[in-house]
């Protein structure tokens, strides 16, 4: 059957529930009707159909309809994180050569237009009670090699890189998740993570491919989600550490009857939280993935969830993983682990093969192995344990924060001589941002926050600032950030600036 995955579901299962938003619901047939109306509307707006369109929107039915409509038109969708600053958005639009921007916020249209050389239009509203524009479905879409979505992720130097994700990548990811979690059309996946993140978009794509339903939320609200789970409105939910810690106090002692799995991503979580989940009969599936891998490529098998607390899991269907150990990795051995620690490298159909504009081509070797930059090890049973993420990447509340971005922003203040940004363990957020500074002169922490304003998004702001006499360094002069997170840090901290 040719055409889109939505067309396929609407033909085979027209009355099957596809999508929920509060008290509203759409079958696959109703969803297709709405999407076709949106496709016709956008088609009429474009003088010449673009190859790529950016979308600036938060979770909503209109965002879902817009994404699917653009795919029906054969257009690549660049998803913009709405929490970024104007400067960050402007860079992404220009780097992706995106001439059209669709925005959900009417007041933001002029602002977004000023950031691009092209045109901005307001996201369409639902065509309820109006004449639905005609649309002729396109058959030559959803091809494996076609780019479906583009998301930006920072590199280890902090420079954002565009990740083109093909329908083939998304297909491999959806089918691997289906096999691991035994997903059926009876499942309903609760999605309170942003659709502009791969964790959110992948849920929508699983629905289209596998025929399950999605209950979408504008944002995460622990009380609302607990109420829906108590009412049996979901069987699987995707959460990050912060969401899980907020939800946990609202979970009954015997858990939720309808909830099969909590898929946990977005970085580290305290083992104490996972143990509390076990006590409440919650099956937490830890996972490992990233934008470049179209969501999870490693996950715990459900039957091992309670036994392997702390592990990210085993590779999913079609994914190959190796630990590249060489001389550079020797100093990462730990007393708790006797297995060799090295860089996690991946290969498989869910993994993108390039960055936009051919950035960082060295991350793929000639055999297609992708070098993640993350450090980890495999235990005797082949379970992956991640030691550190993407060369000191901080993941706080599910958001990726690269230290280099924050460090460069801090160095704009003349009082800051050196800056080293690290992620500190945080039971609520997974990790929180801390900045260690050497100073040219005394400074109040509020002045540091004022310096960051407008340079980087608020979620990247450090929660703690430390003044250090000197940075711990290697013989070659590189800052030893791991010492700033160890007990030895007391030898370096002079004072905590924001206390």
What are the residue ranges of the model-derived segments?
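Conserved AMP-binding A3 loop
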Residues: 27-29, 148-172
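AMP-binding/adenylate-forming catalytic domain of the ANL superfamily
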Residues: 457-478, 497-499
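Conserved pre-ATP/AMP-binding loop-to-beta segment of ANL
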Residues: 14-17, 132-152, 159, 182-188
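Conserved AMP-binding/adenylation subdomain of ANL enzymes
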Residues: 171-188, 196-236, 250
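Gly/Ser/Thr-rich phosphate-binding loop
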Residues: 235-239, 248-307, 320, 327
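AMP-binding/adenylate-forming catalytic core of the ANL superfamily
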Residues: 63, 101, 348, 353-354, ...
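Conserved AMP-binding/adenylate-forming
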Residues: 24, 39-84, 400
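Conserved ATP/PPi-binding loop(s) of AMP-dependent carboxylate-activating enzymes
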Residues: 314-318, 328-363, 399-401
């Amino acid at each position: 059957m040719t055409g889109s995955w939505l067309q396929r579901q609407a033909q085979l299962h027209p009355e099957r529930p596809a999508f929920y938003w509060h008290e509203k619901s759409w079958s696959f047939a109703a969803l297709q009707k709405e999407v076709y109306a949106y496709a016709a509307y956008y088609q009429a707006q474009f003088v010449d159909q673009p190859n790529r369109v950016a979308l600036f929107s938060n979770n909503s039915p209109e965002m879902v309809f817009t994404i699917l409509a653009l795919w029906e038109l054969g257009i690549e969708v660049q998803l913009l994180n709405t929490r970024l600053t104007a400067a960050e958005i402007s860079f992404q639009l220009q780097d992706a050569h995106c001439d059209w921007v669709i925005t959900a916020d009417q007041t933001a249209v002029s602002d977004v237009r000023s950031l691009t050389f092209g045109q901005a239009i307001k996201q369409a509203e639902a065509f309820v009670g109006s004449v639905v524009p005609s649309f002729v479905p396109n058959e030559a879409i959803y091809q494996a090699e076609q780019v479906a979505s583009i998301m930006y992720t920072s590199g280890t130097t902090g420079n954002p890189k565009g990740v083109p994700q093909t329908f083939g990548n998304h297909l491999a990811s959806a089918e691997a998740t289906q096999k691991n979690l035994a997903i059926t059309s009876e499942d309903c996946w609760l999605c309170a993570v942003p659709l502009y993140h791969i964790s959110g978009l992948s849920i929508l794509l699983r629905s289209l491919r596998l025929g399950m339903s999605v209950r979408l939320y504008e944002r995460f609200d622990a009380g609302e989600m607990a109420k829906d789970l108590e009412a049996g409105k979901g069987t699987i939910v995707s959460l990050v550490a912060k969401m899980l810690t907020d939800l946990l106090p609202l979970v009954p002692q015997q858990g939720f009857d309808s909830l099969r799995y909590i898929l946990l991503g977005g970085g580290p979580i305290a083992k104490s939280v996972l143990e509390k989940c076990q006590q409440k009969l919650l099956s937490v599936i830890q996972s490992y993935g990233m934008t470049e891998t179209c969501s999870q490529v490693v996950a715990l098998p459900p039957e091992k969830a309670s036994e392997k607390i702390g592990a990210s899991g085993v590779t999913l269907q079609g994914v190959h993983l190796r630990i590249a150990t060489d001389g550079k990795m020797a100093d990462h051995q730990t007393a708790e682990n006797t297995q060799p620690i090295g860089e996690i490298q991946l290969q498989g159909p869910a993994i993108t093969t390039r960055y936009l504009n051919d950035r960082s081509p060295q991350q793929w070797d000639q055999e297609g192995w992708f070098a993640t930059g993350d450090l980890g090890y495999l235990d005797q049973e082949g379970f992956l344990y991640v030691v550190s993420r993407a060369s000191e990447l901080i993941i706080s509340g599910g958001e990726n924060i690269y230290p280099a971005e924050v460090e460069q922003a801090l160095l704009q203040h003349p009082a800051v001589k050196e800056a080293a940004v690290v992620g500190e363990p945080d039971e609520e957020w997974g990790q929180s941002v801390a900045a260690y500074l050497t100073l040219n002169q005394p400074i109040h922490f509020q002045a540091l926050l004022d310096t960051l304003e407008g340079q980087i998004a608020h979620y990247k702001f450090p929660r703690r600032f430390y003044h250090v006499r000197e940075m711990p360094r290697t013989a070659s002069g590189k800052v030893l950030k791991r010492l700033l997170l160890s007990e030895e840090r007391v030898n370096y901290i002079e004072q905590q600036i924001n206390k």
